[in-house]
Amino acid sequence: MWANLRVTSAAISGLVASHVGIARALTIESRQGSNTSTISWTTCPDVNSTQCAFFDVPMDYTNPNSGSTVSIFLRRYPATAPADQRLGSLMVNPGGPGGSGSYTIATIGDYISTMVDGRYDIISFDPRAVNLTGPSTACHDSEYKFADRMHQVNMQGAPFPHVGGAGETAHVAKLSAIQSSHHAACVENGNHEMLRNSGTVAVAKDMERIVEALGEDGLNFLGYSYGSILGATFAAIRPNLVKRMILDGVSDAEAYFTDVLEWGRSGVQDTPKAFAGFISTCIDAGPAQCALAVTKDNKTETIESLTKRLDALYTRLGNEPLVIGDSLAGPGIIQAQNLQSVMFSMMYNSGGWSSLARDLVVLEQGNGRDYYPAVSGIVYGTVPEPYTQNVFNRSMQSYPANTRESVYPILCGDSPQSNITVQGYADYFREMGKLSPMGEQLALIAGGCRGWSFRATERYTGPWTVEKGLKKTRFPILFVSLDADPITPLASAVKMSNGFGSESASLLIQQGFGHTSNAHPSLCTLTNLRGYLLDGKVPKNGTYCTPEPGWIYPTNSTASKRSMLSKRDKGLLEVVGKIGRSKVPIGF
């Protein structure tokens, strides 16, 4: 999911100032139609349709006069509508934690702009500890060291399939030791001040500073996945500044801040539904559309037989890993836990299920040459890309390594100290595996906080309900959830929207498979989102939408139906589809 280059803040500052002319000394350029912005924007060197800037904020908001600062890197796709139709800025967070906002705008900023008729400046930023925002957490002084450590985690992986007993505990002990080696590197080498000040509350306060610097009187926000936690935190501490807020793919913010292991449990409630959808849609599509829908002896699969077939592949790889002599990512092996990891990530994007089915058939046949880069690249970002001297291309057009590293200071720093034992960690893996067919993969993330030493300077621990003191927001938040999302279940969206109350929240539910509404496009959902952002129309709580047919497995019939849509609706669905199939990692 993440990519290849880690560049320190000092190096970036020098390169940017000398090579691309983005420096804090630049003359202020205000947003068109406003003369109150105090952010200096200039054309980005990599994607000329976007503008970039640095913006300084206090390192520690509990001690703002300490003199230490964080340099936030921002990027925006300017509004294209006539000046009298513009609505200000729409801030986007792609999730994570640790998602690069600058990469998001560079990659899909124009698509988001099209969704809102060009009436907003589409803006985002690299949160603390992420990409070009500095100073870096600096746990590792080279990309190689971090990549090597991630490779070790990859090869050890979650204990799957479970074998039980001392062998399983020993496996988890080794995995935890590898994860702890990263934590130790942060203790020995890292920027401790930054590691303690990269939490969600600090980023929410950065957003407030950015809004003020833009000269705007409140926040318009679109947050995906972890972005729902960031948005909900902002709404909880600055309810008067919420102008428009869509939280799509809703995570349980209370569990996130209270108990990282419970947050993991809450996240996999609907993973079984997503996996069942992968199986059932394949069977329904048939062999002509889904390569897994036919057996080796040319018989039609059933849901039960296909499920057993995939279980058999896991067992085979668990007993004897597949050896890869060469591939784009080099030689290696594919183990059961590697397959499960990629399967989990592919549950996010139902538009890619037909490709996944083809890959699995090839893997069954003992050919993992083309599949192995997915093990290294999709999950750990180690697929090599052509070298370029342009630092922006190296940092923003691929997903940066320090973004992967930022998961720990954000996720682990936001939660209380995790003192789970090795045996407790092993038990947690087994528990999560029973909750979900791929629960071990989220256990690997949540349990990875074991032994993390740095707590965020500020953490928000509530209230999370009106009854306990949560204040009314200036404008209602729109929560959006698919009913079969593998990582942010519908139950979390119901809990969060109920917590903010009927005066401050409304929930839109969409039938569909994948992570966030972009994963399974719906014209109904899109119409409601546009009405909310463009006209201030809040959908009735509990509004239910269905996806457009033919997204997962297109047919001539569904193509014919789509051709009957208006030019505008076809264009909007096409844009959402591009976001859903983009390389931007939306979510955790």
List each language-model region with its residue ranges.
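P-loop NTPase catalytic cores that bind/hydrolyze ATP
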Residues: 332-362
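Amphipathic alpha-helical substructures
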Residues: 365-382
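Extended, H/D-rich, highly charged conserved domains that either
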Residues: 380-389, 393, 397-405
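Glycine-rich, aromatic-lined ligand/substrate-binding cores of catalytic
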Residues: 352-355, 366-370, 403, 415
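Short edge-strand/loop segments of extracellular domains
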Residues: 96, 363-366
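Gly/Pro-rich cap/lid or specificity-loop segments adjacent to the active site
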Residues: 28-339, 409-588
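Second-shell loop/turn segments in exported
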Residues: 193-194, 342-345, 398
